[in-house]
Amino acid sequence: MMDRKNASPNSGTVIAIRGSVVDILFAEQLPPIRSLLTTGHQHQILIEVFSQLDEHRVRCIALTPTQGLARGMLVEDSGGPLLAPVGKTILSRMFDVFGNAIDRKAPPIGTQWRSVHNEPPAIAQLATKSQVFETGIKMIDVLMPLERGGKAGLFGGAGVGKTVLLTEMIHNMVGQHAGVSIFCGIGERCREGEELYREMKTAGVLDNMVMVFGQMNEPPGARFRVGHAALTMAEYFRDDEHRDVLLLIDNIFRFIQAGMEVSGLMGQMPARLGYQPTLGTELSQLEDRIANTDSGAITSIQAVYVPADDFTDPAAVHTFSHLSASIVLSRKRASEGLYPAIDPLLSNSKMATPSIIGRRHYDLAQKIRSTLAQYAELKDIIAMLGMEQLSPADHKIVARARRLERFFTQPFFTTEQFTSMPGKLVSLNDALDGCERILHDEFKDYPESALYMIGSIDEAVSKYRPKLDRVNSQ
């Protein structure tokens, strides 16, 4: 836990408790907003100042459960805001929002403590050069390339594969990524965090990774601050160590949801659909700190739960505006077994321009999108009249699109235990080569199943070419 030897002697008294909301009376000096206060018999209850009611009273939100708290109890001002541990010694460790180690090991030695509330980098410090960040996942690298130092969102409802895709990206990137990876779990299942820790440990990539959790069983105040704590750690590695950082957030919607709970507890007037009126400001305070500067880059990939698959929900709309790439997961594709269940027509990236990814990649991506869009339009005709009513040109479009859809499926390392299929990491050049050959009808005689759940296109060739040669020779 953070050092309180230099804590302020300022103290107050609890005068009202309403769930996680605590009103405190300070007879002398009023603590500033965002100050961390401690109370309870063993100073185990941590409270953050949310607003100042008058010259003697503050209204606070509890960051820990308030069991045992009573009116009249003494409250001490810690003398500053919530702090997070930073330094090389936090690598390979797992923390909660307060910087306590939760991996059943001794607390790290020699850590520094910094405020979780920091300002975004100045505009003059931001790097403007755009670079592509490869993931090893075919559909993402070809159609919606990610930006180094940018923010990508994984949008989807419940059970379409957001966490699996995020975990796969960690697996692929931590191995080839020279920097540091920080996983921030906001309001998600404790079980997933424990599984992720074991997987990363087994894969041997934990040495360059930090995990921070504020899970769904914790009070809204803790879930609301854990994202800021993870960002403080990321900023240390970027600004002090000059290393690139991969920040993975699961789930940014739970951050917004925690803010909504805090807003409701504080009695603020709700905005549309019950969201807090300060939704845009709160999200910007977090997102704007994720940036690419001259000293290094923080690249962020964020899972975004979409309530009831409604992409007009204010939480989804506000998150969209901060992202350089949006990866939309489709329940329909998941039901068809096309994993990763990414919708190629709804997903997009600001990086997909000729000046950044090159003319060949751009033209190929546009041709793939056009083919898949034409196939989507033809599906209604096929459903009503059958394939026989299509023209020869439309037949070719359907054949190419269906083979592209299957080629874009990919077995994941993180699902090997469920599917019994070894995971595949595919380079961008191999993915582009495969798409180009499919669009040139090189695989029109191959069954669609030959392209399903493979890595590079050469796997289909080596597996089915002997069979085709035997058929042709007969």
UniProtKB/Swiss-Prot annotation:
Entry keyword set: ATP synthesis, ATP-binding, Cell inner membrane, Cell membrane, CF(1), Hydrogen ion transport, Ion transport, Membrane, Nucleotide-binding, Translocase, Transport
Gene Ontology CC terms: plasma membrane; proton-transporting ATP synthase complex
Broad class of where this protein is predominantly found: membrane
Protein's cellular compartments: Cell inner membrane
Record InterPro entries: AAA+_ATPase (IPR003593), Alt_ATPase_F1_bsu (IPR017691), ATP-synt_VA_C (IPR055190), ATP_synth_F1_bsu (IPR005722), ATPase_a/bsu_AS (IPR020003), ATPase_alpha/beta_chains (IPR050053), ATPase_F1/V1/A1_a/bsu_N (IPR004100), ATPase_F1/V1/A1_a/bsu_N_sf (IPR036121)
Catalytic activity: ATP + H2O + 4 H(+)(in) = ADP + phosphate + 5 H(+)(out)
Top enzyme category: translocase
Entry's Gene Ontology molecular function annotations: ATP binding; ATP hydrolysis activity; proton-transporting ATP synthase activity, rotational mechanism; proton-transporting ATPase activity, rotational mechanism
Cross-referenced SUPFAM superfamilies: C-terminal domain of alpha and beta subunits of F1 ATP synthase, N-terminal domain of alpha and beta subunits of F1 ATP synthase, P-loop containing nucleoside triphosphate hydrolases
SMART domains in UniProt: AAA
Pfam families given in the database record: ATP-synt_ab (PF00006), ATP-synt_ab_N (PF02874), ATP-synt_VA_C (PF22919)
Binding-site residues for ATP, renumbered to this chain: G156, G157, A158, G159, V160, G161, K162, T163
Subunit annotation: F-type ATPases have 2 components, CF(1) - the catalytic core - and CF(0) - the membrane proton channel. CF(1) has five subunits: alpha(3), beta(3), gamma(1), delta(1), epsilon(1). CF(0) has three main subunits: a(1), b(2) and c(9-12). The alpha and beta chains form an alternating ring which encloses part of the gamma chain. CF(1) is attached to CF(0) by a central stalk formed by the gamma and epsilon chains, while a peripheral stalk is formed by the delta and b chains.
UniProt function note: Produces ATP from ADP in the presence of a proton gradient across the membrane. The catalytic sites are hosted primarily by the beta subunits.
Family label: Belongs to the ATPase alpha/beta chains family.
PANTHER family: ATP SYNTHASE (PTHR15184), ATP SYNTHASE SUBUNIT BETA, MITOCHONDRIAL (PTHR15184:SF71)
The protein's name in its UniProt record: ATP synthase subunit beta 2
Chain's gene name: atpD2
